[in-house]
């Protein structure tokens, strides 16, 4: 019989407070460090993570993860993609034998494409999409995780292994033969029965965030049956997050599980009627996704009501993977700093609440939290704003097309890029020197102009039709704007993992948003002065700015989005006055904020479309508005993409084998569209045959008069040799396709 715990967190970040894993991975990939050093760095990081929870009585432990938990699970289950089977086992240097196949699946090789990558539920974290088929057979190998777990036990850590659950793993998988991944659910539960028995631990945590989504009743029956079998092992803890736990409790309560975890933040503390107190309720009352301080008094009151019904433990609403490590090194103005809690502060909040629930209240800490909550509520910087909004509509698309054809005079199948070009060491060095004040702002801006000179010249040499300035001045497509808008702040060390070795530093949107001055106009003007071709003005859209920031939670997202949209509308007007004929307003994140339950989706889609249109509707009809979208499974949102009313929509498509085309075709999409023909996330130059094939597939689904030719995403993370070689292939493919269709615009 297991003993209950009283305090924990749902999970921990893996990248390191100083991004140690990022730098070790990049060193291993470029050959500057050996595998043993990478393995040692990863071990040090998991030890440090476990030690950070020394005040809690149960520690989640996912082992040394080198890229992504879903990819870790695929490796444990023996279902890394078959195309990487010929990669030999790794030498015994502390890394798993399968690590080179694992990295091949994550990043691709010179000849093999990587697995698809998309967003983890409605977050800004990315996972690698498992590839299965009807013939998939699971071959269990948890030896690396078991070894890591034993190391923690030797260190005296009360660790519990954390696994991605069978339902979630299969719900997020894709098949290569059109079969249903969930057909494997009974077989996978049998594998998990063996897997959890292999752990010599009191508790085993199995994460099932898929249980907060819409799940078919017959699948829920299979899930209940599967977990009834797993519950024969003591100490099985099924954790859910990113939504209400009611469906999970309706499915799993009373079947003999040791614990069930629920998110009490995303939709608040719901009734949880199915919980009768038979199992430990792990109450996710501290927000694991956002960075606002917890109202400890309100949280304690909710916990006490639950504790009257049965045993509970205090936890975070989800893994702390999604928030920065600590406020400790941040130089943030005191008023706003008091409103915030990063990872280590949230761990402290969990401990404070657990102690208070046990009768040991830290009155000073609770008083400080209450004062911070009151300060935020009454600050003039967060006061509601009432204003009349301008219109959200432009002229008809037919009218706009006619005017834009005359204004732009582009060829059929026009070629362009998404916006950014390589952020070279010299660019990063100039930015770092500016931060350290070792160069002046004037010297920095001259270095950026020199980079724009290079980018424009190379694009003209390659023969691209519509150019970009390359965005050398932008550290990040959201952070750049947040640093120029009132109502935001930037952190110095607020890094979170986006995927693999890529980390981002989300800005904090803490108050009312406004634009004190133009943000991009001078860079556009300089770039346009260098060429006779059209240069796109480049902006990030309101939904993406919200999605990739930590956003205030004290007013509706729709209200905050409209504030950002109005600032962008002013910027668009200034770009047009400066001569811009094409303006791109990127919304790569528009799908990732889509609610997980169908009932909640219409309201989100309405306000997200409204905010984009509020930003862009001031543009004259002869100005072409572009937008760009990433990681987008378009079947669910295609009607909203149409409703955005952008003249051209470029879409990440190459990595998913042009799956977006079916949605475009079935919807009768009549606007301009550019499904990406080069997967920029894999470090390889696409072959002419590969790009030709993707472009041919696009032409079979899209009218040539609508079609643009472009990469999947921006080129910021790629190197110049790869970029030039790949764009050369892309431009040549477009030229040959033009000859075949014999069309001009």
Swiss-Prot record:
Active site location: 681
Any one GO molecular function term: zinc ion binding
SS bonds (residue pairs): none
Record: residues binding L-homocysteine: 418-420, 471, 586
Documented EC number(s): 2.1.1.14
Pathway: Amino-acid biosynthesis; L-methionine biosynthesis via de novo pathway; L-methionine from L-homocysteine (MetE route): step 1/1
Superkingdom of the organism of origin: Bacteria
Assigned keywords, A-Z: Amino-acid biosynthesis, Metal-binding, Methionine biosynthesis, Methyltransferase, Repeat, Transferase, Zinc
UniProt record, GO biological process: methionine biosynthetic process; methylation
Pfam families registered for this protein in UniProt: Meth_synt_1, Meth_synt_2
Signal peptide (UniProt feature, chain positions): none
Residue positions binding 5-methyltetrahydropteroyltri-L-glutamate: 19-22, 119, 502-503, 548, 592
Necessary cofactors: Zn(2+)
Binding site for Zn(2+): 628, 630, 652, 713
Family annotation (InterPro entries): Cbl-indep_Met_Synth_N, Cobalamin-indep_Met_synthase, Met_Synth_C/arc, UROD/MetE-like_sf
Residues given in the record as L-methionine binding sites: 418-420, 471, 586
HAMAP family in UniProt: Meth_synth
Functional note: Catalyzes the transfer of a methyl group from 5-methyltetrahydrofolate to homocysteine resulting in methionine formation.
Descriptive protein name: 5-methyltetrahydropteroyltriglutamate--homocysteine methyltransferase
